[in-house]
Design a protein with these regions (language model features):
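Catalytic glycan-binding domains that act on GlcNAc-containing polysaccharides
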Residues: 24-193
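Bacterial N-terminal signal peptides
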Residues: 8-18
Length: 193
């Protein structure tokens, strides 16, 4: 991945690197409450964690603990029982890459780090795992921008990483945790003439 576009986006992500209060829109939500705790415990900027969560399961400004994502589609189950049943149905249909919970943790790659599928839908466990994973990615990659890029798209997928980072930055800005920098705007927003 080009370090140039990463450095451009870093300016936008840097804005939210100071400790900040929980997002008022999600203060009563299960996922949001756990984000404030995980950000504090793991030293992750809440704005980044929240913007990643919004990108993953955000709908009308709230995150969803019982979301499932597979093959580009997201299903919002009403409760954990319905979510687990939906997961089992997806698996019976042959789907392997299924993302679960508040932060859409991929079961295929990360499921062995949880005691069960049901545990992956637990907001405290899901968000805590995502926070630790982002922190690990930042240590390995050297910046929050690259950590965010790798969170969803993994390595060797520059176009998907760029799209994902731009979506996270847009959510960072729309949630009030950051502001567009000129460099981030020029990278993420197509010019209209």
């Amino acid at each position: 991945m080009s370090r140039t576009w990463c450095q451009t986006i870093a300016a936008a992500l840097f804005i939210c690197s100071a400790p900040i209060a929980a997002a008022s829109a999600g203060e009563n939500g299960l996922c949001e409450r756990e984000m404030a705790r995980a950000a504090r415990i793991h030293g992750i900027p809440l704005g980044i964690l929240y913007a990643v969560g919004l990108t993953e399961t955000g709908q009308r400004g709230a995150l969803h603990p019982y979301a499932l994502g597979a093959e580009g589609q997201t299903l919002f189950a009403r409760n954990v029982s319905e979510a687990v049943t939906s997961f089992e149905t997806m698996r019976q249909k042959g789907l392997r890459l299924i993302d679960l919970g508040c932060m859409q943790i991929n079961h295929y790659y990360h499921g062995s780090n949880f005691e069960s599928v049901q545990a992956m839908f637990d907001p405290a466990k899901n968000v805590d795992y995502a926070a630790r994973f982002l922190k690990e990615l930042r240590a390995r990659e050297g910046s929050w921008t690259m950590a965010v890029a790798r969170y969803n798209a993994g390595p060797n997928n520059d176009p998907a990483q760029k799209r994902y980072v731009c979506r996270v930055v847009a959510n960072l800005v729309s949630s009030g945790f950051g502001a567009w920098t000129e460099q981030a705007r020029s990278l993420c927003q197509p010019r209209t003439t």
